[in-house]
Amino acid sequence: MPNHNSVPSLTRSLIAGGLGFSLVALCVFATVATGEVWLYRKLTVYGAYLFWTALFILLGGLALGSLVVGRWRLPKFYLLFGLAFFAYAFGWTALYFALRGFHGQWLGLLVGSILMAIVFAAGFRVMRSILKFAALLFVANWIGYFWGADVNDRFGGTAGLMLWGVVYGLFLGAAIGAVLHYAQVQQWKPENS
């Protein structure tokens, strides 16, 4: 039976989450950089976003699964991560498509981060941590997304988009790693037993 001591450290969770999800985002953004027009034509815009969401879930669950101990180990972690990332993607795309531009992006990041936090908190049965999880995810998401967008603007083209993915994935992955760490540590506190 796993215990508090078997949960990966916060440092390991930040580093493994950041680096692992950075590689995931690099792969996903590479398909955007090289195949966006083709995917839009074959799958429609909404189908392309669904494809990218599925790719994030497939690769992200694999990259982040080692940070979870106990009952949420692979493949069960895929279900939790899949629901969390799908909720995030749904919130982000709904607001982005409704509002467009900067307002759609930042409100999408906010709502998506809140939805992801709710799913993780519910999955680990630490509902009191929703606000902390949402704040962690939103701040890191904001930094990674907009700093990555700035890098994309500076470099442009395929390289810019791929670097955007690296920056975005590094920050969001580190935040997800932190959330997974705190969620598991919180589970072992007496009030959650």
What are these regions (language model features)?
Residues L19, K76-W92, K132-I143:
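Transmembrane alpha-helical segments of multi-pass membrane proteins
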Residues A89-G104, L115-R125, L136-L137, N141:
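Conserved mixed alpha/beta catalytic, RNA-binding, or beta-rich assembly cores of soluble enzyme
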Residues V32-T53, R71-K76, A89-L110, R128-S129, ...:
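Membrane-helix interface and helix-disruption motif detector
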Residues S13-F21, L50, I57, L80, ...:
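Small-residue packing motifs within transmembrane alpha-helices
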Residues T53-L64, L110-A121, V167-L180:
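Hydrophobic cores of alpha-helical transmembrane segments in multi-pass inner/ER membrane proteins
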Residues L67-L80, F120-A135:
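Membrane-helix interface "capping/anchor" motifs
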Residues M1-L74, A178-S193:
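N-terminal topogenic module of multi-pass integral membrane proteins
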Residues R125-S193:
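C-terminal transmembrane helix-loop-helix hairpin of multi-pass membrane proteins
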